[in-house]
Amino acid sequence: MAIHGDRDDELRLFQTGEHPCGYWSDRVARDLVLDPNDRRLGALYPLALSWGFRRSGDLVYRPHCAHCQACVAVRIPVARFAPDRSQRRCAARNADLEVRITAATARDDLFALYHRYLTHRHANGGMDDHGPHEFEQFLIGSWSHTRFMEMRLPGHDGQPSQLLGVAVTDVTEHGLSAVYTFFDPDHAARGLGTFAILQQIEWARREGLPHVYLGYWIRGHQKMDYKRRFHPLEAYDGRRWHDFDNDLDGR
């Protein structure tokens, strides 16, 4: 299908065939994908985020399933966000960490941590066999302005710092997009996933960016439910963004 402004400005969208759902093992899914050959992808990406799309590698997609509308695009309005008690405790628990924004380039230590994370947290989930090529293909876009937000335990007595987690983050003119976060499973008690989002919110504030996009919230999916703990949260209903409503957006 195509969305037309004028012929030279045509925005092409493709609908994929059905494929196994990445969230529910008993369901199939399909997506809408922006034309991956469109040279304007980098410029279109901020607008696509505002339409509920997401990036995976060089693909910009949005779920478009025939019989399921469980995936709800959500974002945090940075200016209105206030951490709750649990999130403040998480920030305090990780106050000893160094947070560094680095270039999105493949490194052996990053891949080793990514592989450990997938092996422990997503065993037999279809991603735990990723090699260095899949790591780069999945997380690093050729046209996106991507950065790695590294969370590190400082070194002492001449020892190097220890990499505990990485939040892959796209930087756009309208906000940050939290693409993927992985961390050392031995430090799961730190709540590094929550800490990463808190740091992305602070990053957006420093840059004067209005939103942090969290991808999709899915009712009843344990690994996605943490997103609604950030208040306020905005949800996209296919036409506009509005304050998240647990009953309404549960579809």
Swiss-Prot record:
EC id: 2.3.2.29
Entry keywords, A to Z: Acyltransferase, Cytoplasm, Transferase
Subcellular location: Cytoplasm
Function text: Functions in the N-end rule pathway of protein degradation where it conjugates Leu from its aminoacyl-tRNA to the N-termini of proteins containing an N-terminal aspartate or glutamate.
Coiled-coil ranges from the UniProt annotation: none
Catalytic activity reported: N-terminal L-glutamyl-[protein] + L-leucyl-tRNA(Leu) = N-terminal L-leucyl-L-glutamyl-[protein] + tRNA(Leu) + H(+); N-terminal L-aspartyl-[protein] + L-leucyl-tRNA(Leu) = N-terminal L-leucyl-L-aspartyl-[protein] + tRNA(Leu) + H(+)
One biological process term in Gene Ontology: ubiquitin-dependent protein catabolic process via the N-end rule pathway
Origin superkingdom: Bacteria
Organism of origin: Stenotrophomonas maltophilia (strain K279a)
GO CC, one annotated term: cytoplasm
Record Pfam families: ATE_C, ATE_N
Family recorded in the similarity comment: Belongs to the R-transferase family. Bpt subfamily.
GO molecular function: arginyl-tRNA--protein transferase activity; leucyl-tRNA--protein transferase activity
Protein name in the entry: Aspartate/glutamate leucyltransferase
